Structures are given as structure tokens and as C-alpha cells.
Amino acid sequence: MRNDPFQRLGLDREVLTVSQLNQRARLLLEDVFPQVWVEGELSNLARPASGHVYFTLKDSNAQIRCALFRQNALRVRQALRDGLAVKVRGKISLFEGRGDYQLIADTVEPAGDGALRLAFEALKEKLAGEGLFASERKRPLPAHPRRIGIVSSPSGAVIRDIISVFRRRAPQVELTLVPTAVQGREAVAQIVRALQLADRQGFDALILARGGGSLEDLWCFNEEAVARAVAACATPIVSAVGHETDVSISDFVADVRAPTPSAAAELLAPNAGDLQQRLDGLRRRLVLRMRDQLLRERLRLEGVARRLRHPGERLRQQAQRLDDLDMRLRRAFERHLAVRHERLVRLETRLAAQHPGRTLALLRQKLDSLAARLPRAAREVLKDRRQHLEGLAQTLNVVSPLATLGRGYSILLDERGRAIRDAGQTQPGQRLKARLAEGELEVRVEDNHRTPVTLSLLD
């Protein structure tokens, strides 16, 4: 009897109001479940202006309403959202006004995938803050790759799917597998080493691929070491991890995210039909460009032709211009002659009014007198000059060396034509010239005393 809660409440003999029933039920629940941990998934999350948080905690079979009051909500560090798996600590209670059974929570912690998702969001926020997800870092994929490296597990359907796509779409592309574990404790270190090795091989692009799986299975692609290894690759890289709904940190860091490994292969495998279609499009664009260019050049040529007149036309215009200039020159010359003639007439009129007849007659008489005296004066001057010249000639003849030579003397000249005035200027055997009044003699010095020089004629 003691353990019968209904008997303790007196429900076997007492009729209660609804309020009394709800109150007693609340007290009973709070007494039996003073504190409990419950695990489930968040849904129907609501945040009114009061600061309280209301949500539903559910699993696959049941659900319970929860209330997290403001003072406790402020202590919850992780961001709450629908779908997050959590562990909630609190006490079971009942809202008497509606009779709703609920959990009054005081602590909310991530549970299972929830903890992983919180770690995912924390790392995502950190790397985004460093700029590793920035679009400026994203490199374009090569349009026509020749060598592609595949960082993935050597077993499984992933590598076969990738090879199948390339064989069908671009068999000319060389594929190289860089093997690595994609799950387990060693996966992170192996993926980092495989990425570093592949980046040194000179591939045109890399594919980081893994098939689908749970969040725990794919977690190695959410590790910071793998994310930084992807970011450090100098080779453009496509991340293809899991199924289309799976998103990993490596997807954000890579240059391109593909929803599946096969989709990654299609991104890098140029389809022959697509290439032909692209070439056809380029050919059409080229033809249109050429037509437009030809049309522009034709219009430009026509414009130049309109501006460039025929040489004959230019000659006719120049001839017409020359005729016009000739006529203008003639008219100007005639006007100039008329002006000059008019001025000359005026000058003649003025000259006739001031004719110097008497002055000219006197000047003419004076001129005639001077003309008569000029020949006589000229003869007198010429006679005086001739007499003076004859006197000078006589004086010159007296002092002339030629006159001395005429009296039997001679002038001795050395080889340089210099006159010999002293015997000391000669040497025995020296040849000299003796200039006479008539002709010259070649002589040789026999001796050169200060006494008269002895000369001998050369044979």
C-alpha cells in the first residue's frame, strides 16, 4: 500500500478537479524524476523574445517537449538547431495550464553525431576565418587535362567508377592512382602524405575521392590536417567525398566540389561530343567575327575611296585654281601699272612746273669748258709723270746688280740659291753657281782663304 502512488494521493476515494490532478501529477513526476539525462534529436526549436528556448526532443518512436529557461540557455555554448543530436539533463515536470508533460532542461550537450557536427562547425568557422574557403583562392580546372592523379583507396567502387567515366569520355587522359586509406586511425596521415606526393608529380589536376558512409566513416576528410594539405596543393584539386548530400571540410577547401566521384571524373574528362559542339560554336563565332571584320573594313575602304578623289579630277581642280591665280595676278599687275602710270603723270606735271632750263644751260656751258680743258691738263700731268719715272729708272739702273754684272762682275750662289758674301761660307770641293750678266757658270771651290778665292771652271 505504501508504494501505491494513487493511494498516497487519495485518488481511490477522492474526486479531484483538473487543476488538482495536474498539480499532483506534477509533484509526483518531480518527486520520481528529480534529475534525468535524455538523448535525442532536436526539432521544433523556438526562441521567443523572453530568451527562453523551447524544443522537442525525439527519437524514432517518441518525443517529449522541453523547456530551457533563459538563465540556463545562456550557459549552453554550442549553437542549437533542428536535427542536432544532443543529451539533455533536467527534471520531468508538467505544465499545469495545459496538462503538457515536459522536460525542464538545465544542460544541453552534443551527443554522437552532434559532437562531431559541432567540431565540424568549429573547424569550418576557423578555416573560413583564415580565408581558406575564399573564392579568390579557387583555381580553374584545366579544360583539356592530360595527366590526372587520383587520391583514393585502391579497392572499392570509387576508383572503378572514375576509370569507367574516363574510358568512356576521355580515354586519352593518363590516370594515376595515389593509394591511401580513406577510413580509420591511419587515414588522416596517409591522406596527407598521398596529397603531398601527388602534388609533386606534375599532374594537371587531382581528385580526392571516397564513397559514401556515415559521418564517422567520412570524418577523416573533416580533420584539420587533411584540410590544410588540400589547401597547400599547388595542383588544382576536386574533392569528391561521399554522396551528394555529404559535405566535408575538404569540399570547402578544394578548388571544386563534386557531389560524387563519378561527377568529379566528368568535370575533368572532356567529352568528345562536347568538344565537337564547342569547336562548332567557336567556328561559328569565328565566321561571324570575320564577316563583321570584313564588313567594317569594306565600309572603311568605301569611306576612304570617297575621300580619295581621282588624280585627273585633282589635276583639273589644280588647273582651274592656277587659271584663277593667273587671272588674279594679271588684274593685280594691271592695277599696279595703272597706279604707277598715274603717279608718273603726276610727277611729270610737277617736273614741268619746275623745269630747270637756265640752270641746265649754265651747267652745260661749264661742262663744255671743262671738256675743252681736260685733254690739255691730262697731257701736262702725263708728261710730268713720265719725266719722274725716267729719273727713277736711271737711279734704279745705277744701283741694280745687273748693272754691276754688266761691268764684268759675277754673283756666287750656293746649292740653295743663297748669295756667297764671305769665303768662310764655302768648303773646298763645294760646287757653286756664278751668275754673269749673260748666263751662268758651274764652279768648284778649290780653296777658301780669306784671300781672294781661287775658282776653276768645270769641264
Curated annotation (Swiss-Prot):
Disulfide bonds: none annotated. GO terms for biological process: DNA catabolic process. Its main location: cytoplasm. InterPro entries: Exonuc_VII_L, Exonuc_VII_lsu_C, OB-fold_nuc-bd_dom. It catalyses: Exonucleolytic cleavage in either 5'- to 3'- or 3'- to 5'-direction to yield nucleoside 5'-phosphates. The lineage of its organism: Bacteria, Pseudomonadati, Pseudomonadota, Gammaproteobacteria, Pseudomonadales. It is an enzyme of class 3 (hydrolase). This is Exodeoxyribonuclease 7 large subunit. It is found in: Cytoplasm. One of its GO terms (molecular function) is nucleic acid binding. PANTHER family: EXODEOXYRIBONUCLEASE 7 LARGE SUBUNIT. Keywords: Cytoplasm, Exonuclease, Hydrolase, Nuclease. One of its GO terms (cellular component) is cytoplasm. Bidirectionally degrades single-stranded DNA into large acid-insoluble oligonucleotides, which are then degraded further into small acid-soluble oligonucleotides. Its EC number is 3.1.11.6. Signal peptide: none annotated. Heterooligomer composed of large and small subunits. Belongs to the XseA family. It comes from the Bacteria.
